[in-house]
Design a protein with these regions (language model features):
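Gly/Ser/Thr-rich loops at beta-strand to alpha-helix junctions
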Residues: 58-61, 179-185
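Catalytic cores of soluble, metal-dependent hydrolases
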Residues: 165-166, 181-187, 194, 207
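A short glycine-rich beta-strand->turn/loop micro-motif centered on a GG-aromatic cluster
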Residues: 175-182, 197-207
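A short, acidic, amphipathic alpha-helical segment used as a generic capping/interface helix at domain edges
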Residues: 156-170
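Small-residue (G/S/T/A) turn/hinge positions that recur once per unit in extracellular repeat modules
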Residues: 146-148
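Active-site acidic carboxylates
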Residues: 1-141, 169-170, 189-201
Length: 207
């Protein structure tokens, strides 16, 4: 069995931004790995001069875990305090693009729509007027099949642009961990695609 240090060296995490999505106690029952193994890996990665970011569903957005309690949970799972001291924490919330995801709209089509909204400073798809929709449909007529337009026009639900987009925009050389792969992790992936930020996913620590 390969050691964590060997995995870190083999995968080449040096200088990467490791963005961990919703690896927190509320979701531990659905994970396919042990939180302490993930924390031990982060300790090794941090030693390779990587930046560590924790995106989580917390007290400010969803009334869930506080940042202090989250940090204590990480320490209980063997995360080094030196890693904690330099890590970045962001209470992100969720369900920005879930209506499209849950209705099986193509990820690239959702990302294109999110990019259009972001670049045109439209935070809520319900604020899209006829002119904005026409502009979007023209811009992506060769790639999208009006899936987003058809879905949102027929429902009262929406896509909204979270502050998370501005946060993610700062980072490069991104490696993702966490989950859920068809839920919050996918929302982060779509946000990165919309921002045209290349990323990879480390499947050993996804759920």
């Amino acid at each position: 069995m390969k050691s964590l240090k060997h995995i870190v060296n083999e995968q080449g995490f040096s200088g990467k931004t490791i963005i961990n999505v919703d690896i927190q106690p509320e979701y531990a029952g659905g994970m396919f790995f042990k939180p302490y193994e993930w924390c031990e890996w982060l300790n090794e990665v941090d030693g390779e001069s990587s930046r560590i970011v924790f995106l989580y569903n917390g007290a400010d957005t969803l009334g869930m875990i506080s940042e202090d309690d989250y940090k204590n949970w990480l320490i209980e799972n063997a995360l080094d305090e030196s890693v904690l001291d330099t890590a970045i924490f962001y209470d992100k919330g969720y369900a920005f693009f879930r209506y499209c995801i849950d209705n099986y709209i193509d990820d690239d089509a959702v990302a294109n729509f999110v990019r259009f909204m972001y670049e045109n400073d439209i935070r809520d798809s319900r604020d899209m007027d006829r002119e904005a929709w026409a502009k979007y449909l023209r811009q992506y007529r060769r790639t999208d099949k009006k899936e987003v337009y058809t879905l949102l026009q027929a429902s009262g639900d929406c896509v909204h642009i979270p502050d998370l987009m501005d946060f993610l925009k700062r980072y490069n050389n991104i490696v993702l961990t966490g989950g859920g792969v068809n839920e919050c992790l996918k929302e982060v992936e779509i946000a990165l695609k919309a921002l045209k930020k290349p990323y990879s996913t480390f499947s050993k620590f996804t759920y």
